[in-house]
């Protein structure tokens, strides 16, 4: 790299004039490099507010699910922060979430340990652009609606959204039923997925994605969705599976 070669020459005692004549770099630029040797990272363009359409990115759709489930966007001095809380019991989910953040922004992710969990934190001024659902108060106390471009991405492939939502606010359990019969009590066990959220809007986003995938579901409580049919569970097992 020209920058590294120029700094190396200056460190060996070459004058600014000599290095400028050899490399074609101005003396002013060379002085600035001496003060701050590290190259400046170019500002990342925001894909949501750019002139071109947001490209289909499974990492973003997955991150959208994680944000709706366990994330928040907040202001920190002159920038914005995304914070997603992940349980320490499921390190693979934490690692996948971190990879998704890096894939979307190209920026490093900090890990802030808490009791029983870890907050993944990333600073970027454009987080409100990528998550227009951001707002004051808790999510279940305000309207949550996907923007048109977000809905288009989800329709392209709803699986990453479900994969992000399900681990954050859901689980895969084994349901056991005891049925009395003339011959005695018979026990049935079968797996099922549950998804719980106090926001009716987020529940609808989740079930709309299941509908797009042709996965049957039912509401077992006012704030909970159950997926229990054998074919539906098998479908979720194909791209979600148990937490790990």
Tell where the protein language model's regions lie, with residue ranges.
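Internal intein/HINT superfamily modules and their associated LAGLIDADG
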Residues: 1-244
């Amino acid at each position: 790299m020209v920058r590294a070669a120029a700094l190396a020459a200056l460190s060996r005692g070459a004058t600014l004039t000599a290095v400028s004549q050899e490399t074609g770099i101005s003396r002013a630029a060379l002085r600035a490099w001496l003060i701050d040797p590290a190259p400046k990272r170019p500002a990342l363009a925001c894909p949501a507010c750019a002139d071109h359409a947001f490209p289909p990115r499974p990492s973003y759709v997955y991150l959208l699910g994680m944000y709706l489930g366990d994330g928040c966007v907040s202001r920190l001095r002159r920038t914005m922060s995304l914070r997603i809380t992940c349980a320490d019991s499921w390190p693979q989910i934490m690692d996948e979430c971190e990879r998704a953040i890096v894939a979307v922004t190209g920026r490093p992710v900090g890990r802030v340990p808490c009791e029983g969990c870890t907050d993944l934190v990333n600073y970027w001024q454009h987080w409100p652009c990528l998550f227009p659902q951001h707002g004051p108060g808790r999510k279940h106390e305000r309207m949550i609606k996907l923007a048109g471009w977000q809905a288009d991405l989800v329709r392209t492939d709803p699986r990453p959204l479900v994969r992000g939502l399900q681990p954050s606010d859901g689980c895969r359990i084994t349901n056991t039923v005891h049925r009395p019969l003339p011959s005695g009590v018979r026990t049935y066990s079968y797996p099922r997925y549950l998804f719980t959220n106090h926001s009716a809007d987020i529940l609808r986003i989740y079930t709309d994605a299941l509908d797009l995938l042709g996965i049957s579901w039912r509401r077992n409580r006012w704030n909970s969705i159950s997926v229990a049919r054998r074919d539906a569970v098998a479908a979720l097992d194909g791209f979600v599976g148990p937490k790990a």
